[in-house]
């Protein structure tokens, strides 16, 4: 296995909270997939959830080497959790096409948050 992509992003949670207070769920609807949006809506700390997903998707787009845009949308990256609660990452559409261009086979993700910040790191590997 070889690392073909690495991305990290950090988000100030208060900034996301302020955006949600000002614009409602507009950002959430742009960033989150339908499944993620359902979790966000029911979450006890929706702004924190959104900040972590935003950081994760930005980190994934950086690992792909494209950033958001250039064929990769927030909607093409899904962040879930496995049965143990660890975060997982799945690519579709433009993000999947870029993953295939890189001849990548797996993505690893780590997400953390503290009082004021959410941070995520994504590593993409090929065989």
Swiss-Prot record:
Cofactors named for this entry: Mg(2+)
EC number: 2.7.8.7
Physiological role: Transfers the 4'-phosphopantetheine moiety from coenzyme A to a Ser of acyl-carrier-protein.
NCBIfam families linked: acpS, pantethn_trn
Protein name: Holo-[acyl-carrier-protein] synthase
Encoding gene per record: acpS
Compartments where found: Cytoplasm
Classification via SUPFAM superfamilies: 4'-phosphopantetheinyl transferase
A Pfam family that the UniProt record links to this protein: ACPS
Protein keywords: Cytoplasm, Fatty acid biosynthesis, Fatty acid metabolism, Lipid biosynthesis, Lipid metabolism, Magnesium, Metal-binding, Transferase
UniProt entry tagged with the keyword Lipid metabolism: yes
Catalytic activity: apo-[ACP] + CoA = holo-[ACP] + adenosine 3',5'-bisphosphate + H(+)
GO biological process per UniProt: fatty acid biosynthetic process
InterPro entries xref list: 4-PPantetheinyl_Trfase_dom, 4-PPantetheinyl_Trfase_dom_sf, ACPS, Ppantetheine-prot_Trfase_dom
Residues at which Mg(2+) binds: 9, 58
Record family assignment: Belongs to the P-Pant transferase superfamily. AcpS family.
Gene3D superfamilies given in the database record: 4'-phosphopantetheinyl transferase domain (3.90.470.20)
Enzyme class: transferase
Cellular component GO terms, alphabetical: cytoplasm
Keyword Transmembrane helix: no
Major subcellular site: cytoplasm
GO molecular function: holo-[acyl-carrier-protein] synthase activity; magnesium ion binding
């Amino acid at each position: 296995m070889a690392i073909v992509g690495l991305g990290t992003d950090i988000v100030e949670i208060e900034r996301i909270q302020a955006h949600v207070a000002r614009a409602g769920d507009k950002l959430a609807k742009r960033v989150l997939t339908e499944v993620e949006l359902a979790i966000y809506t029911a979450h006890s700390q929706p702004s924190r959830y959104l900040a972590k997903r935003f950081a994760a998707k930005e980190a994934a787009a950086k690992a792909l080497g494209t950033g958001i845009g250039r064929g990769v949308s927030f909607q093409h990256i899904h962040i879930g959790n496995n049965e143990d609660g660890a975060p997982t990452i799945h690519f579709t559409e433009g993000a999947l096409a870029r993953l295939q261009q890189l001849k990548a086979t797996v993505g690893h993700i780590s997400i953390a948050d503290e009082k004021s910040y959410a941070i995520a790191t994504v590593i993409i590997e090929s065989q």
